[in-house]
C-alpha cells in the first residue's frame, strides 16, 4: 500500500498580539530561490481570499502557503495556462479571486482547477496596472489607455487620452473615484458616465524644469490623500477635497536621487516608500524621514536596496518584493526585543546562547557555547565580547555553561574548565576555581548551571552533582547532601527548599532540616528515560517541571500530576526553561517555539517567527527573569527579552487548507486529482 502524505498548509495563522515594544528595530524574514521561490526578481505581490500570498516574478507565478512555494508557469501543451512567465501585476476582485497581469495579457485564476482564463482583448498586450472598483468593474491601464472591463458580460470600454498625451498611471480611491495620472503632470478625476475630466496641475507651485510624468498614484486606505510619484524625482500628497498638493522633498531631505517604485501606508501617519535606494519611512505629521537600508552583514536586514513592490496581508504583515533579491516579510507583531550575532563592530558574538543574567548595574550578560561572553551595556546599548586572553585575566574557555551575578562578581561556568570569577567593574577574571569531588579527582566536573540563592549562597550544578561555594575558605566544595547525578537546573522555592532537575527524577533538599527527597519518574507519571530540565513553583505551591517529555504539573496535596504535551497543545514535547509571570502564566521555552501556559485554565499560546522570533529552537538552561520583571530567553540564534504584560494574545478563528497531496514524498499529478487539492476546516486558536 502506497504511503500517502497529506500536507496541511496553515495559511498565516498568527495570534493577534497587541504590543508596546519599540518599533525602531526593523527585522525582515528573507525568501529567495533557495527557499523555493521561482526567481529572485519579484515584481508584485498580493494575498487572496484564502490567505495565500501570490508573488509575481519574471519566471512564473508563485503561491506561498506560509511554508512552501508552488510555481505556475506557461505550459505550451495546456490551453488554460499563463501565456507568459513574466508577471507584471497582481490583484484580487471584490470576491477575493486572483487576477494576473503578464507581458502577454490579463488572466483570471480558477482556484478549483488551478487554471488561468485569458481575457481575449488583452492578447499580446503588456498589462501595466489594473484595479477593481467597488462595483467589481475591472480597470486596466494598457497601451497608454484606460479600459473598464465588465467581468460579468465581458464588455469593455476604452477611455483614451487627448492627442499627444498618454495615461501613465491611475488609482481608485475608497470613495470609488477614478483618478488618472498623465505624462504632462496632470492628475484628473474621471466621470465614467460622460467621459469628462477635471484636471489639476500638481506642479503649479513646484520648482521649474521638473520632470512631469506621473509614474504612480496610491490612494490612502484611511484618509482622502493620494500619494503621487513622478518620474526620476520625488513624492507629492494630493488632497482631493481641496484639489491642492504638498511636496514632500524626500530627495532633498536625504540628499540623494531616488527612483520611487512603490507606496504603502502602514498607518494614517506613516508612509512606506519603496525605492532603488532602500526603504524610506515618512512620518506624515512631523515630516521625519527614516531610511532603512540593506546591510550584507546583518541576516535580518533588508535583502536589497532596490524595492519593487509592497503588499500588506490581512494580519497587517508587510511583504516586500525586490528587483533581484527575492521577498522579505516584516511582522507587525513586535512584543519581543531580539538580539542576534552579525559582523558589526558592537554586535553580539556567537549564536548558541547557554545562559543569561543581569548585574546590579543593569547590564545583560549572555553566555554562549561558541564565542565566550557578551555584555549588553546598559549605558551604550552596545555589546562587548569577552573570550580567553593569552597571558591571563581572560576566560578559561569560549564554551560557557553557566552564568550568575552576585554584587560586583560574575560567576562563569565551563565544560571541564571549572569556574571563573570576573570583577564586573574591571571586567577582568580575578580568580579560577576547580570543581573536584575529592583529593583523588584530577578532572573538573562539567558545569550545567549556576544559581545564587536568596541568602547569597552559590550553588553549581554539574555532571557529577552539586557544588557549593565555601565563603570562609574561598573554594567550591562538593555537596554530598545531593545525589551524585547530572544536574540540569537548580531552583529555590518559597520555603527555601532547593530543587534539582535530573535524569528520570527531581530531588529537593531542605537546608533547615538537612533532609531531602526524590520525586521519581513514577510519581511524575512519566517515562523512565525522561530528563527534567527546569523546575518552578506556582502561587498555589504546585511544582512545574520542564522535561523532554513535555511540561508536568505536580500537586503536593494530592500527589497527582498533569501533563502538557503535543497531544494537548504544546508545540513540542521538549521543554527547556520555565519562568512564571505575575498573572499566573508560565512562559516556557521549547524546541519549537515560546509558550505561554495559563496555570488556571491550561490555555496554551505558542509564539514563533510570525510574532518576531528569530527561531523557534530555544536552548538548555537559557532563561532569566530580572528584578524589573523582564524575561530573557536564549536560543540557538541569539536571545530575546520582553515584559509579559506587553504581550496580550487574542484568539482568532483561522482557516486550514489542504494545499497539496504527496505520494511517496512527491506532489500528485493532475491525472491523480482533477481539481485543486484544497479543502477547508475552521479551527479556533486556543
What function would you assign to each model-found segment?
Residues 52-54, 97-99, 137-139, 177-179, ...:
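Conserved beta-propeller blade signature
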Residues 59-61, 104-107, 143-147, 183-187, ...:
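Loop/turn residues immediately N-terminal
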Residues 129, 154, 195, 225, ...:
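Coil residues (strongly favoring Ser/Thr
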Residues 26-33, 68-74, 114-122, 154-162, ...:
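Trp- and S/T/G-rich repeat-edge/linker motifs of beta-rich repeat architectures
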Residues 1-27, 45, 52, 179, ...:
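Bacterial Sec-dependent N-terminal signal peptides
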Residues 19-53, 74-87, 123-125, 163-164, ...:
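Residue-level "micro-hotspots" composed of small/polar
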Residues 65-68, 110-114, 150-154, 191-195, ...:
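Short loop/turn segments that connect beta-strands within beta-propeller blades
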